[in-house]
Amino acid sequence: MGSSANNPNLTPIDLTVHQRASTRKPSFWSGLGWRDGVFAVLMIALFAYGGLKNRDLMDVYEEVILVFSVLSIVLLGWFWRPLQWIFAVVAAISLLAVSWYGGDLTRGETVFGLKYMFASQPLVMWMSVLFILATVAYWVGLIWPKLTTISWLGSKLTYAGLVMGSAALMVRWYESYLIAPDVGHIPVSTLYEVFILFALLTTAFYLYYEEHYD
């Protein structure tokens, strides 16, 4: 059987419509799968739990910010799917650190997992180490293109650094409230935090375009 282009019964207009239909890209919503649905449900449930638990401490503006935050995270996770597991791992590390602190900031110096891994400062140091190792791996892969495994390793190290840095900001946010309620702040209030955020945004943009054009 021949294609529709060889069908003598089709007019030029029919052919044009058929060609447009065959080349039309699927819509954004049609590309979503069950994993995207599970991700959305988990994020909404997590934010709903946090909002309900702290409702007495929030005003209407903070509630609106909370709603738009969860919508933004869900849409970003749908747009670039690696963000789904990044958000999940960052949330897991952050909740683990919060549980280990137990409302006592001094535990950051006595609990091994906090002192060397999941307090904000160790997380930032791990981020820095991973970014340095990733840079070395990328340079080796650039100089010797046949060593594809090295470039792959550089990408994975970069993802790991992104996770560590993001978790550092979340844990630092909690730590600031442990110092004193009036000291608590969103972790973009100092130059130190802004530099970390800049590194994370630059890394996220790079990883997105690396995957997009790979």
Role assignments for model-derived ranges:
Residues G2-T110, A119-D214:
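Hydrophobic cores of alpha-helical transmembrane segments in multi-pass integral membrane proteins
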